[in-house]
Design a protein with these regions (language model features):
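Conserved anion/nucleotide-ligand pocket segment
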Residues: 141-167
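N-terminal glycine-/serine-/threonine-rich beta1-alpha1-beta2 phosphate-ribose binding loop
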Residues: 2-101
Length: 167
């Protein structure tokens, strides 16, 4: 059964690009979430407050860093991963594996191939991610950049007038 937590879910935001900036603002807006860290790859963003990076008009008291080890050492409950993965697919997989093994849940915008990887990606790759999650007691959810629309609702809408769908 679902229970309400007494303490907020401690979250690290991984990147402050377009989606990452929106994620920082969304995390801040939810009282059940606590932003505890922000990863950036751009040296110019290191040390800048997450609120400013997100385009908010206030500081959130969380300075961005490029120190991966320091962020993992915080022991966050979850990482919201919005770093670009379509052109650095294996980099994303390696990041997810590391986070899962460390016991950190991951919610990611990509790579979209992980939304349903069976029959697309090698089973060994899928099995390795699953094993990392089991070993760390953590989960991975890839929702894409547009959850609730393109990959789940749009196909239903587009096929709603169909009499038959051949798979």
């Amino acid at each position: 059964s679902m229970t309400i937590r007494d303490v907020p879910i401690r979250v690290v935001e991984w990147s402050t690009g377009y989606l990452g900036r929106m994620a920082v603002e969304a995390i801040d807006a939810r009282p059940e979430l606590e932003l505890v860290g922000v990863f950036v790859s751009d040296p110019a963003k290191v040390g800048v407050d997450a609120g400013r990076l997100a385009g908010m008009d206030r500081d959130l008291g969380v300075a961005a860093t490029d120190d991966r080890a320091a962020l993992l050492a915080l022991g966050p409950d979850a990482i919201v991963y919005t770093a670009e993965t379509e052109t650095r697919f294996m980099g994303g997989i390696e990041d997810f594996t590391e986070f899962l093994r460390a016991g950190i849940n991951v919610v990611a915008s990509g790579p979209v191939l992980l939304q349903y990887p069976h029959g697309i990606l090698p089973e060994e790759m899928i099995d390795a991610l699953a094993a990392a999650g089991r070993d760390g007691g953590a989960t991975l959810h890839v929702g894409g950049i547009d959850p609730g629309f393109a990959n789940d609702v749009l196909p239903l809408a587009m096929t709603s007038l169909s009499r038959r769908i051949d798979l």
